[in-house]
C-alpha cells in the first residue's frame, strides 16, 4: 500500500500494548500481514528508528530492541547514568559503551546554589522518613507541613521570600521560573499563595491533570519533578527553585537540564537544604559531587529563613 507519510511518531505505551497483544494472540494481526512481530517495520517501510529518553524504562527498551528490525537505530539521552550499580551494568549491555557517541565536555552554563534554611528550636510535628528511621521521603515531609497551619504558613513564607529574591527582584525581560514541589497538595497550595502575593504576573500550577498550556503560558509555574522534570521545554526559563530533596544523579541532572542555554538570560538552579535535617545535608553533598562537572558553578546561599 502507498504510505502518505515520511515520519511516524508513536509512544512507548502504544508500542508496549502492541507487543503484549501480539504475543498473547498473534492470529488477528496476521490478517494485516504481520506474520512476525518485527513485520511492523517492514509493512510501514521503517528504516530508521529514533528513540528519545532512552535512559527510562530499560526493561521495555531492551524488549523493544528484540522486536525491532530496521537498518538504523538512534537512542537519545542526556542522562544515561545510574546510581545503582546493577542498573548501570544492565544499561551497558543494552547500550554498549563503544556504541555511544561521546560529545566530550558538558556545555557548562548553569549556576547552581544550595539555598540553606533552618528549623526553629520550637518546631514540632515535622516528618521526613518512611516509617521510623526509614529512608527519606519528601512526600512525607510536605504532608507533615500541610497538616500544621503554623508550619504551612512558615513554609509558604520561605518559598515566597526565595522566589522574591531570586526571581522577581532580578527578573530579566520575559524570563520565566519553575518551582518544584513533590505533592499535588503542596503544588496547589504554593501556586495559589504565590499568585496572591505576586498578582502582577501569572502563576500556574502544572501537574498531570492540568492543561499543558499552564506550563508554557505563565511567568511562574509550580510543578512536580514527574510532571515537568523531563521532556519539556519552557521558553525563556531562567530560574528553577527546587524544594524537593532528591538524591538520584539522573533526576538532578534532568531537572537542572530544563534550563536551556539563552544568551540573554542567565540559567540559575536553586535547591533548598534544611541544615537541621541530616538527609538534606547528605543529599546536598551528593549533589555537589554529582553535578560538579556538569554545571558552571555550585555555591551556597545561607539564608536567615526558619521553619
Predicted regions and their residues:
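Conserved interdomain hinge at the start of the Helicase C-terminal
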Residues: 129-182, 189-193
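Conserved segment of the helicase C-terminal RecA-like domain
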Residues: 258-288
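Conserved Walker B
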Residues: 13, 53-55, 228, 244-245
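Post-DEXD/H (motif II) to motif III coupling segment of the RecA-like Helicase ATP-binding lobe
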Residues: 44-114, 299
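Conserved SF2 helicase motif VI
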Residues: 80, 239, 247-266
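A short beta-strand element within the Helicase C-terminal
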Residues: 221-223, 232-245, 268-271
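Conserved two-lobed SF2 helicase motor
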Residues: 2-31, 215-230
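Conserved helicase ATPase core of P-loop NTP-dependent helicases/translocases
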Residues: 188-228, 251
Amino acid at each position: 500500500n502507498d504510505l502518505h507519510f515520511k515520519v511516524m511518531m508513536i509512544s512507548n505505551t502504544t508500542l508496549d500494548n502492541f507487543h503484549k497483544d501480539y504475543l498473547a494472540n498473534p492470529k488477528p494481526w496476521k490478517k494485516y500481514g504481520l506474520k512476525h512481530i518485527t513485520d511492523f517495520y517492514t509493512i510501514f517501510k521503517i528504516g530508521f528508528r529514533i528513540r528519545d529518553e532512552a535512559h527510562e524504562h530499560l526493561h521495555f527498551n531492551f524488549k523493544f530492541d528484540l522486536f525491532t528490525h530496521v537498518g538504523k537505530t538512534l537512542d537519545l539521552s542526556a542522562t544515561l547514568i545510574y546510581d545503582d550499580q546493577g542498573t548501570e551494568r544492565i544499561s551497558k549491555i543494552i547500550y554498549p559503551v563503544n556504541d555511544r557517541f561521546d560529545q566530550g565536555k558538558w556545555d557548562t552554563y548553569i549556576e547552581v546554589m544550595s539555598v540553606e534554611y533552618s528549623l526553629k528550636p520550637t518546631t514540632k510535628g515535622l516528618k521526613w522518613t518512611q516509617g521510623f528511621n526509614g529512608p527519606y521521603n519528601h512526600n512525607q515531609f510536605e504532608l507533615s507541613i500541610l497538616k500544621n497551619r503554623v508550619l504551612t504558613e512558615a513554609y509558604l513564607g520561605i518559598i515566597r521570600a526565595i522566589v522574591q529574591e531570586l526571581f522577581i527582584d532580578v527578573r530579566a525581560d520575559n524570563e520565566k521560573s519553575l518551582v518544584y514541589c513533590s505533592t499535588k497538595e503542596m503544588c496547589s497550595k504554593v501556586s495559589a499563595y504565590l499568585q496572591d502575593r505576586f498578582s502582577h504576573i501569572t502563576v500556574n500550577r502544572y501537574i498531570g491533570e492540568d492543561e499543558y498550556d499552564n506550563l508554557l503560558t505563565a511567568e511562574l509555574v509550580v510543578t512536580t519533578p514527574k510532571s515537568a522534570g523531563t521532556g519539556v521545554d519552557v521558553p525563556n526559563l531562567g530560574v528553577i527553585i527546587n524544594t524537593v530533596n532528591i538524591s538520584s544523579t539522573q533526576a538532578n541532572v534532568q531537572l537542572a537540564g530544563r534550563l536551556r542555554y539563552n544568551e540573554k538570560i542567565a540559567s540559575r538552579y536553586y535547591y533548598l537544604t534544611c541544615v537541621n535535617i541530616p538527609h538534606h545535608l547528605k543529599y546536598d553533598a551528593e549533589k555537589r559531587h554529582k553535578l560538579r562537572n556538569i554545571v558552571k558553578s555550585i555555591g551556597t546561599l545561607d539564608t536567615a529563613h526558619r521553619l
